[in-house]
Regions:
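Glycine- and acidic-residue-biased ligand/ion/polar-headgroup-sensing regions
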Residues: 67-70, 77-92
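Short intrinsically disordered coil segments
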Residues: 79-81, 138-147
Length: 160
C-alpha cells in the first residue's frame, strides 16, 4: 500500500485548521495531507493532529510507508505511542509484526532497529501528544530517522 504524492490535491494544514475552527469538524484523506519522502530511506509519510495542529497536547497520527527491506536505526520518542501494521511486515527489535498487529510503546523506552519485510510495510502510528520526534539511541548517527526533515513539514510540541 504505497502512498502516492498527489501534490495538486493537497490541502495545507492552515486550510484544514480554518475549516475545523469554522465547522467543528473536517473531512480529508491521506492523499490530501502534506507528504514527506525521506531521501535516506525512501520512507513516505503524512501526518495530522487530532484537533487543531497547534495543540501540543493533541494526539498526533502518522501514516508511513517503508519500502522493502528498509532499515531504520534504534530510537525512542518523548511520548507514549501505538503502531498498527496496515499492510506488509516489519521486524521491530528482533520480532516480526504482520498486518493487523498492534505494538504499544512507552515514552523514552528505546526500540529498533526497524526492518521492513520484503513486501515493504504500511504503518499507522498514533502518538499520545505532539512530542513525537524520534530521538536516536545507540550507535546510529540519526540519518535514517532524519527528524529535522520531518520537523520542517510537520508540527511538533514546542519542547520536542
Amino acid at each position: 500500500m504505497e502512498m502516492k504524492n498527489t501534490t495538486n490535491d493537497s490541502r495545507s494544514i492552515k486550510e484544514i485548521n480554518d475549516t475545523l475552527k469554522k465547522r467543528g469538524h473536517v473531512v480529508t484523506s491521506w492523499n490530501e495531507l502534506p507528504q514527506v519522502t525521506m531521501d535516506e530511506t525512501g520512507i513516505e509519510t503524512s501526518s495530522y493532529r487530532v484537533g487543531l495542529s497547534d495543540n501540543d497536547d493533541a494526539p498526533t497520527v502518522f501514516k508511513l510507508y517503508f519500502p522493502p527491506n528498509c532499515r531504520v536505526e534504534a530510537h525512542t520518542h518523548s511520548c507514549d505511542y501505538s503502531e498498527i501494521i496496515i499492510e506488509g511486515s516489519q521486524k521491530v527489535s528482533g520480532k516480526w509484526l504482520y498486518k493487523g498487529d498492534i505494538r504499544v510503546g512507552l515514552a523514552n523506552k528505546g526500540y529498533g532497529p526497524l526492518i521492513a519485510g520484503p513486501e515493504g510495510a504500511s504503518i499507522l502510528v498514533i502518538f499520545a501528544d505532539g512530542n513525537w520526534p524520534a530521538i536516536g539511541i545507540g550507535a546510529g548517527d540519526g540519518s535514517t530517522i532524519n527528524a529535522s526533515k520531518l520537523l520542517a513539514q510537520f508540527s511538533a510540541a514546542e519542547n520536542s
